[in-house]
Amino acid sequence: MKVLVTGFDPFGGESINPAYVAVKMLPDEIAGAQIIKREIPTSFTRGTAEVVRQIELCQPDLVLNVGQAGGAAGLRVERVAINLADARIPDNDGAQPVDEPLVQDGAPAYFAKLPVKAMVRGVQAKGYPCQLSYTAGTYVCNAVMYTVLHTVQGYPHIRAGFVHVPYAASQLEGKAAGTPAMPLADITAALAAAIEAAVQNKTDLKEQMGRLD
């Protein structure tokens, strides 16, 4: 089995992006699966194009895109991506779309094609904070997640999804007191646990992880 794992380059004035730094630190094999690691640009246009190119090039069985969610206390396994670009800040190319569809006449939304609840429990079982999330935002992370899920409609054997990671502890300088973060080694280990659960579980757990908000 081949697993394509992507992380973004730095954006928003940050010197690093813990998503790709952690991805680079992953082992080359997890649960018997080959791990293919790629960096993609934080760009609505180039980021989505590059991840589609990598899918076509690598022909993976599973795709996990990883992004930074500053302010998150742990990993967030994303359940849904929406067909909307509404950027609070410009991307790395200076683009700042407002209320634009990602795919003209595309589906309003796609659900992740991964065992998201099993992934949450797998990360938690290793002692790392993790929760199921019902919004990947409206920035480039959501754009990549939506684009990948739209693309793999033509590749029924490919399973795909998205995980957000918190700030790395090394990014906290200059940020407000109490801003949550994790050591990069812990982010990497938590990602590995999520991938292991995704590889080992073809169907998801049947347990309550809903929200009231």
Predicted region positions:
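A short acidic, helix-capping loop that chelates divalent metal ions and anchors anionic groups
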Residues: Q171-G174
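N-terminal catalytic or cofactor-binding beta/alpha core of small enzyme domains
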Residues: M1-A136, H150-H157, A177-D213
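Glycine-rich beta-alpha junction loops
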Residues: G70, P166-A169
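Active-site oxyanion/phosphate-handling segment shared across diverse enzymes
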Residues: A136-Y167
